[in-house]
């Protein structure tokens, strides 16, 4: 089971792993906390955007081979300009949900599915979105309630990301509000990552998942991350996006495993 905050998060962080596990015959279930109705898009925020992004989510899930999609129905908490919690969030915002109640709802799905693996996010929620931090809290507690044996924190290797951003900064002028230094605290350093999953064989499915989220490739005054990713040509796409990273907290940081179900130590 893959637990995400908004539609399109699965495409960016775990799509290759999902497609790989589905191809191996596993039942893959995608659970999403919100419909992403407050995300930046050309569609007006609110119910119309929620409907559109939900349709995009199902299209993405189909491309990845998911057997089931579950929407928990919480409101998108939004993101303030300084990267914190938005002040005008809805009454049912995911960030304001009772963590134990939300964990119970997720645990019910885990038990229904007899899930043997759950993915969440790292404690910082990757880049710090409040809903992503809540996914970490709620998902971790749900796994405890359900007795799910394997919990993986989906993340990004911070080390090459920082190198790439600093190199890009020599040739490209980032917007004034973009602070490369913020990524010094985002995601996870390489020496703490336990799983490096090679998903290059599933680049086609991962790209199709990204393409499904058309609203997230537009909107705003500058280029969107998803739009930039989709412009990368095939061979380079497989190189840049062909690895997905995870942390399993009950394993040593130097485990360096290559499949979600790998054991440590290896037999």
Language model region names:
Residues 1, 92, 96-267:
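Metal-dependent de-N-acetylase/amidase catalytic core
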Residues 1-114, 141, 145, 247-250:
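Active-site rim/loop-helix segments in enzyme catalytic domains that contact anionic ligands
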């Amino acid at each position: 089971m893959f637990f995400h905050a908004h539609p399109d998060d699965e495409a960016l962080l775990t799509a290759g792993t999902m497609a790989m596990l589905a191809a191996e015959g596993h039942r893959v279930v995608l659970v999403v906390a919100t419909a992403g109705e407050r995300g930046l898009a050309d569609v007006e925020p609110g119910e119309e955007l929620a409907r559109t992004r939900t349709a995009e989510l199902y299209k993405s899930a189909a491309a990845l081979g998911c057997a089931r999609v579950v929407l928990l129905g919480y409101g998108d908490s939004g993101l303030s300009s300084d990267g914190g919690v938005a002040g005008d969030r809805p009454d049912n915002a995911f960030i304001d949900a009772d963590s134990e109640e939300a964990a119970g709802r997720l645990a019910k799905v885990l038990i229904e599915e007899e899930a043997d693996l759950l993915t969440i996010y790292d404690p910082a929620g990757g880049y710090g979105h409040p809903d992503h931090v809540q996914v970490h809290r709620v998902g971790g507690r749900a796994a405890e309630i359900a007795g799910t044996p394997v919990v993986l924190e989906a993340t990004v290797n911070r080390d090459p990301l920082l190198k790439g951003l600093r190199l890009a900064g020599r040739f490209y002028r980032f917007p004034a509000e973009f602070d490369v230094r913020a990524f010094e605290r985002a995601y996870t350093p390489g020496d703490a990552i336990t799983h490096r999953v090679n998903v290059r064989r599933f680049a086609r499915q991962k790209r199709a998942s990204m393409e499904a989220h058309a609203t997230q490739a537009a909107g705003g005054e500058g280029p969107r991350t998803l739009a930039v990713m989709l412009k990368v040509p095939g061979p380079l796409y497989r190189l840049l996006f062909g690895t997905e990273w995870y942390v399993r907290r009950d394993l040593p940081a130097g485990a360096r495993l290559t499949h979600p179900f790998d054991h440590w130590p290896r037999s």
